[in-house]
Amino acid sequence: MTDSGSFERILNDLRLAGDTAGGVVEIRAQGVAAGTGEPFFDSIESTAAHLIFSIPGVKGIEFGAGFAAARSRGSHNNDLIADRHGTTATNNDGGINGGLANGNEIVLRVGFKPAPSIAQPQETFDFTAGHPTPLVIPGRHDVCIALRGAVAAEAALAIALADLVLRAGNAAV
C-alpha cells in the first residue's frame, strides 16, 4: 500500500472496530560485501531468519522474489550477470546466492500476524469451569504489530550481518 492516507484510514477503522491487522514489511541492506555469509548452516538466510523468527508475531520470511520465485521459471527468475563487476539486471535472489551475499542489495520481507489481543469480546474455553466463556482483554492494543516489528526486524538483520562479518574475521563492518 503506497497511499499513506488510505493506510491511516484502515488503521483508524481497525482501531474503532477494536480489531487488529497483520502486515508485511520489506527490509533492505546495502553495501554488504560479496562473499559475506556461509554456504550451509550459517547462510545469510538462516542466520537472519533465526533472529527474525525470534520476534513475537513473525510468521514468515522471504528473500528476494521469495514465494513468487517458486511459481516462476528459471529462465525468468535467474539474475543474469550483466558486466565484469557482477552487476545483475534483476535481483530476484535478494542479493544472496548459496547463502553468500552477491554484492547486490539484500532484500527480504517479513510477515507479521495480527495481534491476538483485541478490544472485542472473543470466545475461549475455561478449562476450570469446563465450558466456553467470553474473553475480554482490557487495555491498550496495537492495531498492527508490523509497524513496531519492522524496526525489530531491521535490527535483527543488522545483527545477523554484523555477526557473519565478525565471525569471518573481517572487522570492516
Task: Label each region the model flagged.
Residues 1-40:
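Glycine-rich, mobile lid/loop segments that gate access to catalytic sites or pores
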Residues 14-25, 57-69, 168-173:
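Flexible, glycine/charged-enriched surface loops at secondary-structure junctions
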Residues 41-45, 53-56, 91-106, 147-164:
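Conserved phosphate/anionic-ligand binding catalytic regions in large, soluble enzymes, centered on
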Residues 58-135:
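A translation/RNA-centric and nucleic-acid-associated enzymatic feature enriched
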Residues 33-51, 56, 62-65, 69-71:
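Small-residue-enriched transmembrane helix-hairpin modules in multi-pass membrane proteins
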Residues 107, 115-173:
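Internal helix-turn-beta structural module
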